Amino acid sequence: MLVRTTAGSDPEISLFRLDLRGKRADQALGELSQYLDRALLSGREGVEIVHGRGTGALRKEVHAFLKTFPGIASFALAPEDQGGDGVTIVTFK
C-alpha cells in the first residue's frame, strides 16, 4: 500500500510511504526493493517504510536490506509523532 503524505509545512516536499505490516520478510523485501527502485527513478528525495512495531523482526530485516541498497544516503526511525519505531525514514543520495 502506497500512501502520499506531506512533510512539514512545505507543499513541495513530499514523502511517500510503503506499508509492509503483516507481511513475511521475503515478501516484504521483494516489495521494498521494487518500491525503492521506482522511488529513485522518479527522483524522490526520500520515502517512509512502515514495518510496524511488533517484535521488531521485520524492522531488523528492512534495516539490514537498506544497508546494502545502492542510492540510499541514510535511514532512521521516525520521530514518535510520525510513527516512532514502527516507521523508517529513508533519504536518497
Describe the function of each predicted region:
Residues 1-93:
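Long, charged, low-complexity intrinsically disordered regions
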